[in-house]
């Protein structure tokens, strides 16, 4: 009897170790400890310009909103592009490797702002292909994450080459197309995040503290509506 009980315990433990694909909040009866959320993005995700990005960036605020049972990882890198042919491709960075090795249950992708720069957007014919490659790579993870694609927020900075007309009229529609094509989840920040300069730093690109909170609220509400 003792031998049988031991075998049953070992079997249950082995099942728990294999259950990496859960994307619901875990309770005390679950095999999961936490729901892992990876936030992939550029400087807006990293928290550029904020006094305390570790607590004020939108991933940090999202962690506070989700609370216990969730682990949010900020994988943002300033100035990076979705385009692999851009000047600073995100997929060349350590944070991309970290996001994959994190084996997230939920992935939030917020890229595209830096792709709007003329020297990057000249490769626009590669945008859908490169984004699809990122989606396919994430879908192949053993954790089988839910993937949220975000359209970029309104941003404009002539000196940096960031063009809101390209973001709104070209990049955002392509992100929506990819959502439909892959049957993934959309967070349409280009529409949901107010086009209000009071929510941005003086550079016209990066959210201030209030903007970061608003961004986190929108993303939290979408996760809550679709996952919890």
Label each residue range with its predicted role:
Residues 1-40, 44-53, 60-69, 100-105, ...:
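N-terminal secretory targeting modules
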Residues 11, 50, 152-228:
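Catalytic His-Asp segment of secreted/periplasmic serine-dependent ester chemistry enzymes
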Residues 33-38, 44-132, 166-169:
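Conserved SGNH/GDSL esterase-like catalytic core that processes O-acyl groups on lipids
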Residues 41, 76, 151, 190:
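Active-site beta-alpha turn of Rossmann-fold NAD(P)-dependent dehydrogenases/reductases
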Residues 71-73, 146, 183-185:
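Conserved beta-strand segments of alpha/beta enzyme cores
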Residues 110-114, 138-169:
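Active-site segments of SGNH/GDSL-like serine hydrolases
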Residues 132-138:
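Extended, non-globular alpha-helical segments
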